[in-house]
Amino acid sequence: MVTYKDSGVNIEEGYKSVKLMKEYSAQTFIPGVLNGLGSFAGMFELGKYKNPVLVSGTDGVGTKLKIAFEMKIYDTVGIDCVAMCVNDILCHGAKPLFFLDYLACSNLEAEVAAELVKGISKGCMDAGCALIGGETAEMPGFYSKGEYDMAGFAVGVVEKDNIINGSTVEEGDVLVGIASSGVHSNGYSLVRKLVDNFQVDFFGSALGEVLLTPTRIYVKPVLKLLEKFKIKAMAHITGGGFYENIPRMFKEDFTAVIDKNSFEMPEIFKYIMDLGVDEEHMYNTYNMGIGFVLCVDSKDAPDIIKDLNEMGEKAYIIGHVKRREKRVCLK
């Protein structure tokens, strides 16, 4: 008799992984969660809003996963998966409510899958949202043995009158940059082309470990700011770096004039540049030390930076807005 296991799908390992995942996801539950992992669908009660708008985002971790497999460090990329989604919906003023994940692999290893979900749960707790569902797909022959792919889906809510869309941006507004934790989750295909050995020493740690530093989650500090200040537009600096992401927060034709010397560039970016990547390409690929940008009235900028610093975030005035064509000008 031929069984499903003979084809490469281990149902028992799947049951084991779900049991481990449930323990981690339960730690993320917040008011509004009506059920958790194991049901056919996750349910969340919206609660009291006057005119709620649901805001959704989906993303993955990309080839950063390749380094995780090589280093055998699996939990940090789960945080990345959450960060990439919740930081995006935050750009429109949304508070993340719940998260779902998708894991795909050739042959399921319960402990590895559980470590990935452990990281996702940590990311959800950092963002204040609940992990209420997901899918783990075991597909023999589709992926290389020992490798996983990962994607996430975040849903948040914002009152309709409070949606942030860049419509109030004016010439003279100031750009506040919040520091990144490193490379975050973009540009890893380029890094992997340049680097052969991820075990090499980098300021006392293995380079691979430094590259696996999780993407910073900006949800809690930015939501705190929104209680006190009018933030006109926000940008999450992901793939495409400064050049692609900063113009996305403007509805009209504005130029973001950025002072490259106004913020600290982490050593990891200097290292990548030394491997042969020119500066313009770096700013068109990486966050260069700024993971999130706020567009605010110039009079509010000093207090916003003060509040961010008090919340443990490094923040800088990195530039200003001029009415010109929609682009970024680095000085």
UniProtKB/Swiss-Prot annotation:
It is found in: Cytoplasm. InterPro entries: PurM-like_C_dom, PurM-like_C_sf, PurM-like_N, PurM-like_N_sf, PurM_cligase. Keywords: ATP-binding, Cytoplasm, Ligase, Nucleotide-binding, Purine biosynthesis. One of its GO terms (biological process) is 'de novo' IMP biosynthetic process. Pathway: Purine metabolism; IMP biosynthesis via de novo pathway; 5-amino-1-(5-phospho-D-ribosyl)imidazole from N(2)-formyl-N(1)-(5-phospho-D-ribosyl)glycinamide: step 2/2. SUPFAM superfamilies: PurM C-terminal domain-like (SSF56042), PurM N-terminal domain-like (SSF55326). It catalyses: 2-formamido-N(1)-(5-O-phospho-beta-D-ribosyl)acetamidine + ATP = 5-amino-1-(5-phospho-beta-D-ribosyl)imidazole + ADP + phosphate + H(+). Its EC number is 6.3.3.1. One of its GO terms (cellular component) is cytosol. One of its GO terms (molecular function) is phosphoribosylformylglycinamidine cyclo-ligase activity. It is an enzyme of class 6 (ligase). The keyword Nucleotide-binding applies. Belongs to the AIR synthase family. PANTHER family: TRIFUNCTIONAL PURINE BIOSYNTHETIC PROTEIN ADENOSINE-3, TRIFUNCTIONAL PURINE BIOSYNTHETIC PROTEIN ADENOSINE-3-RELATED. NCBIfam families: purM. This is Phosphoribosylformylglycinamidine cyclo-ligase. It comes from Clostridium kluyveri (strain ATCC 8527 / DSM 555 / NBRC 12016 / NCIMB 10680 / K1).
